[in-house]
């Protein structure tokens, strides 16, 4: 199915919505519904900007986003959101002229994207096409490296969750953001999606360590959307059994607790649950 043409009106609307969220958050540490709304606005923006793929004002758009984000006084959230924008959508750092040369790349999705924007782009030389192929390959390699870095970041957060200067609630919040960021990294990069099975065990491991049911259901939904029914069904079955055992240690959740679960598939889950 062909991708829709770039809707600049929707893009402007999404940027405006994000700016409004940021403006209303000035002087406030984003929590609860406010942080959720903030993230929803970014996700809507992320759903539009990949269609720009490597240009059509991508650099200018990134500058606008950074300027808007700078209005927030929450350094933690600013850092999370800037990381999300600059790392999860690396195509925005490419030059516009490189997009047309993606015609030469054997990638169906790229081909469809370029079909929707090629009439806006100047012609490029054979040398530029060759350079793009090399840079595109390096970009994907760098993105895989960032995914591994994100998993290492989760490990560090888990290791530091009991430090004296950080509350359990704050640690859990940061972990959930990091895990969602990892999932988005897989979701928005088509190259990652084709090879996601190789990193799925690692991603599930971090979900298991966190033990956060709604995040796991989101991953089940994501798998179903990508037609990975076998993995989605297995994950759903394990999650159902996991939830059945939840009441056994539910009274301890207010302060957090260790858990050890044995699933029918033979998988053993253990970790520390944050409420």
Regions found by a protein language model. Name each.
Residues 1-275:
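Function-determining surface determinants
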């Amino acid at each position: 199915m062909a991708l829709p043409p770039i809707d600049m009106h929707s893009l402007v609307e999404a940027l405006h919505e994000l700016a409004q969220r940021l403006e209303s958050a000035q002087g406030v540490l984003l929590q609860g519904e406010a942080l959720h709304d903030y993230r929803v606005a970014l996700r809507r923006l992320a759903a539009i900007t990949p269609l720009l793929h490597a240009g059509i004002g991508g650099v200018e758009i990134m500058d606008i986003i950074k300027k808007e984000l700078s209005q927030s006084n929450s350094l933690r959230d600013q850092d999370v959101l800037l990381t999300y924008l600059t790392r999860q959508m690396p195509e925005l750092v490419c030059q516009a002229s490189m997009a047309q040369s993606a015609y030469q790349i054997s990638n169906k999705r790229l081909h469809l994207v370029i079909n929707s924007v090629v009439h806006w782009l100047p012609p490029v030389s054979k040398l530029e096409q060759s350079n793009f192929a090399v840079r595109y390959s390096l970009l994907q390699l760098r993105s895989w490296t960032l995914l591994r870095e994100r998993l290492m970041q989760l490990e560090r957060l888990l290791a530091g969750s009991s430090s004296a200067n950080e509350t359990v609630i704050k640690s859990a919040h940061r972990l959930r953001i990091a895990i969602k960021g990892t999932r988005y990294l897989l979701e928005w990069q088509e190259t990652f999606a084709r090879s996601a099975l190789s990193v799925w065990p690692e991603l599930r491991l971090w979900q298991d360590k966190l033990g956060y049911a709604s995040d796991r259901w989101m991953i089940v939904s994501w798998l179903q959307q990508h037609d990975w029914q076998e993995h989605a069904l297995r994950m759903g079955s394990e999650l159902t059994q996991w939830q059945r055992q939840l009441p056994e240690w539910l009274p301890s959740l207010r302060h957090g607790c260790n858990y050890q679960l044995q699933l029918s598939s033979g998988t053993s889950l253990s970790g520390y649950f944050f409420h």
